[in-house]
């Protein structure tokens, strides 16, 4: 998503129960002073990921047609998406009516401005004869066509018959999908340890390429070494601080550190990077007697809610309150 329209400004007196949430809330929202920082952050990131081209690894065939033909046996597409997300293999979901006219060249096919070296077809019993014919042709031209579980039977929508031949391609299991794609060279991000909550987005502009890294884990930080297609001439961009920082590389990879829900952008080329990104470290302090959490209700100046915590914890945890 690269375009946002803030809409939660309400001119009615606060609270207007018919129109939550309220960004400003006539001065009653204690987070409103930080709203400008959030909008600046969103503007910077949105600017970087529009007007260019997304660089995915593979394409997934949209599964609606297979589900309409046989809902009981069709594999939910989100199962495939989850497996790819957890392995840092980026993808686009392509509808069948776009795919059947996609040209093939140099062992890749084109859809819009993007090219793909592989098509993944989630588990289904049937597929239209037109799609089967495209898969057979693309496979013969070097595109990796992967069917999960079993190859679907081709069906002619007009005659409701199953003509032959069956679609070309390779049948792989869901469990073997990730390693199959990696063996085919269709994975550009590799971590030194599994990172199921790490997401990335590779994007190209006329003046260079970037990779967005995001930690989807709401609780745990990510710290690992990541291999990217950029090589050693790279730097970090922090969109919240609007700063460039030289990247810390080691053993052919870059050191990545992300707090929960944090995003950092890796930039090809290190022009403008002034300093090495280093986390601030201090001697640990063990407080005596636990922690006191104070909360000030909206519209007041003094805390009226106090909680005694034996240890410092995630203040956003739903079971804390």
Q: What residue spans do the PLM features occupy?
A:
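Carbohydrate-binding surfaces of carbohydrate-active enzymes
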Residues: 1-321
């Amino acid at each position: 998503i690269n375009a946002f329209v803030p809409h939660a400004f309400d001119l009615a007196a606060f609270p207007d129960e018919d129109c939550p949430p309220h960004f400003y809330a006539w001065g009653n929202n204690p987070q409103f002073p930080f709203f400008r920082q959030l909008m600046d952050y969103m503007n910077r990131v949105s600017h970087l990921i529009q007007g260019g081209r997304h660089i995915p690894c593979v394409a997934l065939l949209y599964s609606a047609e297979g589900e309409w033909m046989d809902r009981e046996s069709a594999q939910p597409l989100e199962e495939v998406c989850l497996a790819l997300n957890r392995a840092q293999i980026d993808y686009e979901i392509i509808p069948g009516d776009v795919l059947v006219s996609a040209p093939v060249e140099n062992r890749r096919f084109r859809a819009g401005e993007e090219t793909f070296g592989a098509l993944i077809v989630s588990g289904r019993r049937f597929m239209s004869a037109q799609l089967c014919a495209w898969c057979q042709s693309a496979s013969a031209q070097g595109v990796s066509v992967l069917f999960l579980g079993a190859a679907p039977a081709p069906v002619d929508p007009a005659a409701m018959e199953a003509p032959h031949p069956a679609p070309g391609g390779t049948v792989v299991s869901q469990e073997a999908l990730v390693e199959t794609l990696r063996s085919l060279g269709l994975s550009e991000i590799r971590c030194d340890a599994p990172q199921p909550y790490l997401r990335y987005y590779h994007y190209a502009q006329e003046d260079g390429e970037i990779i967005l890294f995001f930690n989807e884990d709401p609780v745990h930080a990510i710290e690992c070494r990541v291999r990217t297609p950029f090589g050693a001439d790279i730097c970090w961009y922090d969109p919240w601080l609007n700063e460039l920082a030289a990247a810390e590389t080691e053993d052919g990879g870059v050191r990545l550190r992300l707090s929960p829900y944090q995003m950092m952008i890796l930039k090809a080329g290190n022009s403008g990077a002034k300093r090495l990104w280093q986390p601030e470290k201090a001697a640990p302090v063990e407080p005596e007697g636990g922690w006191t959490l104070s909360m000030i209700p909206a519209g007041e100046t003094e805390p009226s809610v106090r909680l005694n915590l034996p240890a410092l914890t995630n203040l956003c945890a739903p079971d804390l309150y």
